[in-house]
């Protein structure tokens, strides 16, 4: 699952507009996957098990059909990569935990603009969510 932020330019109703600079604007180059990740997605996007999902909140579960897709397929463990460790990855991990999914976070494949928040989140995944951080 490629859960990608989807925002509208200057959306005054979205809470992130007041918190962060414009990012992942629908139709913009900034919303594209980067480098080899984009290559892998383009090569595999037509496969049945590859799913692009727009998300408008921090958690990939919020306002999406992610839980339904996972449960339909009998998936019980989610593997998380991406940015930001202490924002979107964190909120997705918390929702996954609350919905009963096992969690694996790849520490070399998550990042944040806040190093302290990044390190805190990695520990939180282990100590509060029982996640594996590999």
Each language-model region and where it sits:
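Short beta-strand segments at enzyme active-site cores
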Residues: 1-5
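Active-site-adjacent betaalpha module
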Residues: 10, 14-134
């Amino acid at each position: 699952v490629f859960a990608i932020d989807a925002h509208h330019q200057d959306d005054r109703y979205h809470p992130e507009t007041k918190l962060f600079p414009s990012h992942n604007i629908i139709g913009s180059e900034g919303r594209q996957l980067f480098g080899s990740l984009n290559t892998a997605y383009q090569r595999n996007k037509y496969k049945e098990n590859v799913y692009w999902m727009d998300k408008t909140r921090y958690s990939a579960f919020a306002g999406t059909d992610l839980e339904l897709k996972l449960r339909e397929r009998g998936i019980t463990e989610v593997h998380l990569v991406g940015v930001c460790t202490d924002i979107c990855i964190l909120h997705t991990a918390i929702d996954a935990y609350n919905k009963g999914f096992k969690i694996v976070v790849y520490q070399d494949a998550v990042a944040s603009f806040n190093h302290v928040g990044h390190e805190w989140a990695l520990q939180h995944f282990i100590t509060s969510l029982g996640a594996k951080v590999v």
